[in-house]
Amino acid sequence: MATLFIADLHLCVEEPAITAGFLRFLAGEARKADALYILGDLFEAWIGDDDPNPLHHQMAAAIKAVSDSGVPCYFIHGNRDFLLGKRFARESGMTLLPEEKVLELYGRRVLIMHGDTLCTDDAGYQAFRAKVHKPWLQTLFLALPLFVRKRIAARMRANSKEANSSKSLAIMDVNQNAVVNAMEKHQVQWLIHGHTHRPAVHELIANQQPAFRVVLGAWHTEGSMVKVTADDVELIHFPF
């Protein structure tokens, strides 16, 4: 058996091929797993659990079917869907996890997260993140009419795209000191995350021992997952 990790699907109605690929994944590979962990940015945007978007209901039902089949499903918020709440989690059968979680997997201690908190060189993004994660601001935003939230979200996405276009790739990647600090804080030799869309397995030193950082890929033209078994940790790409 295996535990599966995915992230950065950025599901939206404009990308039906990705949605179809995810549905096939849920109906196939996911049903064979010990557990499924979604490490953020499942959706391109999330403006509240009360959004009647049919795609959201379709995904909730599909994930719930996996959960009902006996495969526990877990979710860590990403920078695109950090407002995903308890209502959607309940409808989809997912358990919401904190932004950093340590798992005991087949004899390994593994730290999982979305990964945006590791990009500490991007000071502008970190300041924005700190602001939008304030509970009072989230409560205020979610109290706004849905059409207002949609306009605000569209403007924020446009601003983010414009800001990122002028940033270097290095700034938007993880900071190595932040990686080591996180792994040493949790006393782990394995870290799995997404966010950067740069799939790879990196070797480093943490806790004065060899350590590994496994980065999930985004679902653009193919799927990406990390498969953890008793024997191996594999980064796998597969066609939709």
From Swiss-Prot:
Cofactor: Mn(2+)
Amino acids binding Mn(2+) 2: D41, N79, H114, H195
Keywords linked to the UniProt accession: Cell inner membrane, Cell membrane, Hydrolase, Lipid A biosynthesis, Lipid biosynthesis, Lipid metabolism, Manganese, Membrane, Metal-binding
Location, primary (coarse class): membrane
Topology within the bilayer: Peripheral membrane protein
A GO cellular-component term linked to this record: cytoplasm
Pathway participation: Glycolipid biosynthesis; lipid IV(A) biosynthesis; lipid IV(A) from (3R)-3-hydroxytetradecanoyl-[acyl-carrier-protein] and UDP-N-acetyl-alpha-D-glucosamine: step 4/6
Compartments where found: Cell inner membrane
Binding site for Mn(2+) 1: D8, H10, D41, H197
Binding site for substrate: N79, R80, D122, S160, N164, K167, H195
One of the GO biological process terms: lipid A biosynthetic process
MF (Gene Ontology): manganese ion binding; UDP-2,3-diacylglucosamine hydrolase activity
EC assignment: 3.6.1.54
Reactions that this protein is recorded to catalyse: UDP-2-N,3-O-bis[(3R)-3-hydroxytetradecanoyl]-alpha-D-glucosamine + H2O = 2-N,3-O-bis[(3R)-3-hydroxytetradecanoyl]-alpha-D-glucosaminyl 1-phosphate + UMP + 2 H(+)
Top-level enzyme category: hydrolase
Family of the protein in this entry: Belongs to the LpxH family.
Known function: Hydrolyzes the pyrophosphate bond of UDP-2,3-diacylglucosamine to yield 2,3-diacylglucosamine 1-phosphate (lipid X) and UMP by catalyzing the attack of water at the alpha-P atom. Involved in the biosynthesis of lipid A, a phosphorylated glycolipid that anchors the lipopolysaccharide to the outer membrane of the cell.
Name the UniProt record assigns to this protein: UDP-2,3-diacylglucosamine hydrolase
